[in-house]
Amino acid sequence: METAIEDAGLDRGPTLTSSWDAACGALTQSLFLTRTGPRAQDLDFEQLLAPPAQGPDLVSLKSSLSPRDENPCFIYLKCGPNGGEEILSVGILSSARNMEVYLGEEYCGTSRGKNVCTVLDNSEHEKILLYKKYLKLESPTHACKIKLLSFGEEQCVLISKVVVHLRPRSAKPSPSSPALGSRIDLDNIQTIMESMGSKLSPGAQQLMDMIRFQQQNCLPIRDQLQSVLGTAGHKHLMALQSSPSSGVVDKASSTPFPFRTGLTPSAITENLKALIDKSTQPSGEGNTTNHNECHLMPQNHSLESDLKNAVSSFLPKKASGSSSVPNSELLPFLQNLCSQVNHLRVGHNARWQENVSKPREGTVGVPLEEQPVCSYLEKILSKNMEVMEKKLMKHIDERIYQLQEHIDAKMALLVDLLRSPNSPSPGMPLRHYDSRERLSNGER
């Protein structure tokens, strides 16, 4: 393996820019590129991020806005369009203590800095601590942005070195993304929460149990939804199209689910309530079902929220095992709902009667007509999972930052007390001191 550290003045090298003000061309001088072969191993960033022997040339990044305005410091890395290279990992030696890496708007990871050395800022004549931090990306990319984090809302960040690990862009397509939730280490998250004295809410615990079950069974969300919804009832769909009451249905309509006009919330709610009421009736009262009409509404009524409310009202009951709705009647209801969603006709005067399908034995794969529904539900669950993971990681990072600040303040206070002339000699016992502070879990 050949490794070479080069200056950033190459034509094919990535460009380095910042959201804060810097001297023209000064930021590019701090960029160092490390190119390796396609099968390269991890680099030794401990050595690459070591400060230069002759003293680092610091590049100053300053915010042009007032401290009251929220203006984080971002630096942007982007490979050339014709360079044929991709970024594997990135490391920074700067006065910012931590950094966060984003691929577009997606959070990739956080790297906490390690104190390397103390240098003297020539402009301010102050001692500056430099921290080195690096992060290996989960998947290679041609561009990323890095958020530099400093304590105390610093309006100036000094950068000594930016090291980027590059390799030739692979001709093979990137592998498919892992199953939903497979990258989440639930045991590690729960251990961190317990060590901080916090407990998960019942809703968060239920969500983690669902993710753990999905990880253990290695089933994609699409397969799980298909196992719940079962067959769409292709024969039932043909019966709907051939029946006189369903003549208004447009057979050629193939508009995807998210952009189709919506069902009224009352229609979905009444259907679900009627099904539950029917299941709770005594067996002697018969088994009759009222046919409710489904009305088409304008585009401003969201079908997405209606469907999410209907499905969310069903899922907790089914998961808890306390639902009285029999599966033989619940499955046809969901199948009919999916068929109606996929075959609605855009129009203000169009109405059609909902048919009740017979219970079907067993479940098979969802045909092509229902694929938009499963795909849309999968996107909703994936988005909620990503939002939960980001919020949890942000909360953990904030708590760790607060803990670091607290420890640093106490250590500085302890050092000052030991250096003061009134401090006791090493041979004398120390007096007991109670700060009266309590931990978050109530212990002292």
UniProtKB/Swiss-Prot annotation:
Enzyme Commission numbers on file: 3.6.1.-
Taxonomy, superkingdom: Eukaryota
UniProt main location, coarse: cytoplasm
Subcellular location: Cytoplasm; Mitochondrion
Biased composition (Basic and acidic residues): 431-444
Disordered, as annotated region: 424-444
InterPro entries: PAAT-like
Listed GO MF terms: ATP hydrolysis activity; identical protein binding
Enzyme class, UniProt record, top EC level: hydrolase
Pfam families: PAAT-like
Keywords: Cytoplasm, Hydrolase, Mitochondrion, Phosphoprotein
Known catalytic reactions: ATP + H2O = ADP + phosphate + H(+)
Modified residues (Phosphoserine): S177, S182, S254, S302
Gene Ontology CC terms: cytoplasm; mitochondrion
Oligomeric and partner information: Homodimer. Interacts with ABCB7, ABCB8/MITOSUR and ABCB10.
Role: ATPase that regulates mitochondrial ABC transporters ABCB7, ABCB8/MITOSUR and ABCB10. Regulates mitochondrial ferric concentration and heme biosynthesis and plays a role in the maintenance of mitochondrial homeostasis and cell survival.
Stored PANTHER family: ATPASE PAAT, C10ORF188 FAMILY MEMBER
Name of this protein: ATPase PAAT
Species name: Rattus norvegicus (Rat)
Annotated gene: Paat
